[in-house]
């Protein structure tokens, strides 16, 4: 397990492998969330057992690290990989989120027995809908279908861009090998996920929930 939290007046995020939790003002994407007061002396272990292998909690109001448990330890990224797919999408297409793509048959079939939002082959979706499917349903077909369409079928090229952007964001312990997290080669750290989440918060998509 890995836990990366940003605690303050803006948001609190906790992620445990494939379970994605985002709490931000009126946009609440809740699967499993823990929020607690943030201070320089905050120690979660005083209130509950920290079961995550690594954890990293930052007060976004002060940028003070309020809790650190082996935050540089490299662990399997799992569903967290989708955050990098979303980051790459927003970096290149933040002003085009209402553009559409068609779900490829090969992708829909590939992720059929994994976490999905029932986005079927040949159906048309907006980029925005794919992002919401990833956040709300941990939808593998949303990530893979979007990556396939935007890369012109060059999934390896998309993954290469994910790794380039990840390094530009400042991550040092992350490697991405697919767009959704099904591949076991996807690895990250708690501190890297903090950097990625902080980068994502610079995009207005995560600040509003009026468009879907």
Language-model segments: which ranges?
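Hydrophobic alpha-helical membrane context
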Residues: 30-31, 94
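Sec-dependent signal peptide recognition
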Residues: 18-26
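Active-site-adjacent loops and short helices of periplasmic peptidoglycan-processing enzymes
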Residues: 40-191, 200-204
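Generic structural signal for beta-strand residues in well-ordered domains
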Residues: 4-5, 22, 48, 94
């Amino acid at each position: 397990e890995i836990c990366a939290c940003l605690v303050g007046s803006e948001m609190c995020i906790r992620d445990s492998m494939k379970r994605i939790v985002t709490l931000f003002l009126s946009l609440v994407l809740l699967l499993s969330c823990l929020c607690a007061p943030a201070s320089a002396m905050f120690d979660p272990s005083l209130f509950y057992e920290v079961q995550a292998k690594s954890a990293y909690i930052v007060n976004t109001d002060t940028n003070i690290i309020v809790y650190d448990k082996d935050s540089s330890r490299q662990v399997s990224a799992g569903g967290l990989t989708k955050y990098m797919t979303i980051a790459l999408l927003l970096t290149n297409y933040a002003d085009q989120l209402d553009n559409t793509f068609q779900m490829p048959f090969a992708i829909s079939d590939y992720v059929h027995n994994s976490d999905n939002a029932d986005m079927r082959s040949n159906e048309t979706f907006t980029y925005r809908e794919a992002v919401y499917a990833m956040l709300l349903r941990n939808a593998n077909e949303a990530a893979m279908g979007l990556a396939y369409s935007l890369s012109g079928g060059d999934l390896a090229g998309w993954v290469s861009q994910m790794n380039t952007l990840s390094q530009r964001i400042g991550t040092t312990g992350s490697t991405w090998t697919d767009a959704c997290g099904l591949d076991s080669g996807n690895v990250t750290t708690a501190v890297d996920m903090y950097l990625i989440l902080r980068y994502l918060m610079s995009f207005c998509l995560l600040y509003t929930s009026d468009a879907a």
